[in-house]
From Swiss-Prot:
The active site is at S473. One of its GO terms (biological process) is L-valine biosynthetic process. This is Dihydroxy-acid dehydratase. InterPro entries: Dihydro-acid_dehy_C, DihydroxyA_deHydtase, DiOHA_6PGluconate_deHydtase_CS, ILV_EDD_C, ILV_EDD_N, IlvD/EDD_N. It comes from the Bacteria. The gene is ilvD. It is an enzyme of class 4 (lyase). It catalyses: (2R)-2,3-dihydroxy-3-methylbutanoate = 3-methyl-2-oxobutanoate + H2O; (2R,3R)-2,3-dihydroxy-3-methylpentanoate = (S)-3-methyl-2-oxopentanoate + H2O. One of its GO terms (molecular function) is 2 iron, 2 sulfur cluster binding. Keywords: 2Fe-2S, Amino-acid biosynthesis, Branched-chain amino acid biosynthesis, Iron, Iron-sulfur, Lyase, Magnesium, Metal-binding. PANTHER family: D-XYLONATE DEHYDRATASE, D-XYLONATE DEHYDRATASE YAGF-RELATED. Its cofactor is [2Fe-2S] cluster; Mg(2+).
Amino acid sequence: MRSDKIKKGVEQAPARSLLHATGQIKSPGDMDKPFIAICNSYIDIVPGHVHLRELADVAKEAIREAGGIPFEFNTIGVDDGIAMGHIGMRYSLPSREVIADAAETVINAHWFDGVFYIPNCDKITPGMLLASVRTNVPAIFCSGGPMKAGLSAHGKALTLSSVFEAVGAFKDGSMSQEDFLDMEANACPTCGSCAGMFTANSMNCLMEILGMAVPGNGTTLAVSDARRDLIRESAFHLMDLVKKDIRPRDIITKDAIDDAFALDMAMGGSTNTVLHTLALANEAGIEDYDLERINDIAKRVPYLSKIAPSSSYSMHDVHEAGGVSAIVKELVDLGGAIHPDRITVTGKTIRENVADAKINNTDVIHPKENPYSPVGGLSMLFGNIAPKGAAIKVGGVDPSVQVFKGEAICFSSHDEAVEAIDNHTVREGHVVVIRYEGPKGGPGMPEMLAPTSSIVGRGLGKDVALITDGRFSGATRGIAVGHISPEAAAGGPIALVHDGDIITIDLPNRTLNVDVPDEVLEERRKELPKFKAKVKTGYLARYTALVTSAHTGGILQIPEDLID
C-alpha cells in the first residue's frame, strides 16, 4: 500500500505514534488498512458548502464500513456570487490553483492510498480535479448537490441569475422595490450549488461523463436523502478502486475530455467549463487539445437540454426528467457522439451506467430526434480579435440573433463598463469591449456577470453585445463573448480595438472580427503601452507572473529556463 511509507517499519515508529494521537487509529489492525483522504471543502460563507461537514461524516462512516481508515482535511472555497463585482472576484479563478496545490500537498505529504473528493461550487470541483490527476491516487468525486429553485410571490421560478438581472431592471425603474426584495429573499431557498446550469452544476454534471463520479452526482438535490446515499455508494466504489489500483489517469483520457465537451454541448453548460476542462487536459498530460477540437465536437453533438439561465428549468427539473444519465443515453444512442465504452469509477462503462436511463419529460430534455439545435450549446469563435479563440454560450443567445454587427465602445475595466451601462452611455447597437480583465490583466480573469445582467435586465439582450478577455458566470446570457485570447495584457489584438470600430460576431461561421485593416492594427500596436501588473504583492502578484491566457485553460506556466 502507498501508505506503508508512513506506517511500516521501525523507522516509522514516530509517525505511528502521531497517527495514534489523531484518534483515527482505533485498533492495531487499522495500521494494515488503506488510509483514505477525504478532501472536503466545508465553509460557512458558501451556501453550496455549508452542509459538507455532514456529508464528510457520512463518507467517513462508509469508508470504515468498507475497510478503510478515513482522514478528513479541507480546502478553501470562494463563492463567486458573493465575490462578484469587487476585488474578491480577482481571487476566484486563482483559487482553483490554490485548491489544487493544497490538495496535492496534503495527499502527497501523507501518502494516502485513496482520495474521496467532496466539492460543489465553481472553482472547487476543477481545483480538486487538477489535484486528482496530478497526484494520480485512486479517487472518486461526490459533490454537495444543487439547491432547490426559488419561487417568487408571483409563482415564478427563481435562480440566482434572476436576482442579478433584477438589479438592472430595478435600477432602470422597470421593477418595483417590492418585487426586487421578494426576489432577493426567495431566489436561494436551501443550501447547495445555485439551481441553474451555472458553472458549479455544469462541472458536477461533467464529472459523471468524465467517469469520476457516480450517476446522479450533478443533479441530486443537496437537501435530499438521495445525496447521502450517493456519498455512501461512492465510498464503497472508492475502496474498490483502491483495491484494483484504478487511478484518475486511467479514467481521464483524451476520449474522456472529448466526451465531457460533448455533454457540455448537449446541456449548454457554462463557458467556464471550457477553461477548466482545458486545464484538466493539460494537467493530465493530454497534448494538442485546443479550441478547434471543441468546435469539431460542437458540430456533431445536438443541444438537448436548455436550463436556467437559458430557460426557466432548474437542476431539479433535469433530475426529475432523467438526469445527466438520460442526456448521456441519448448521446450513446446517437452513435459517434461519445466514447461509451470507457471505464468509470463504478467499475462499469459509460454505456453500462446509463443503460436503463430514459427521458421522463421531453420539455426539459429533448430527445435526439428533436433537439433545440442540431449543434451544441457552446461555440468557439476565431478571428482578428481572437486569433487563439473565444467562447460564447450560444444556448443563452436569442435564436433570432445569428449575426450581430455593431459599433465598439471600449473599456479597460469591468467597473468602467458597468458605470457606462448604468448611466445609459451604452446604447442599442453597441458592442461593449471590456479588456485587460484576462487571467494576467485582471488579474484573475474576473466574471462579467454584472454588465451582462444589467444589459439583459434593461431589455437589451438582443440589441447590445459584449466581448471580453475576462470570463462570464454560468448565470450569464445574451450576446456575451468571453475568454478572448490572447488577452490584452499579453498583447492580444483586443487591445487594439478603438471606439467606433465595427465588430461582427458571426455565430454560424464561428467568427469574431473587427473591420479594420491589418496594417492599421499594426500601426496601433506600435502605440500600445507596455502592460504593467495591477497587483504588486501577495498571491495575485505571483499569479500574474505565471498565468497564461484563456486558450490554455488559464494555467500557470513555469518559465522554460527553470525547467529545461
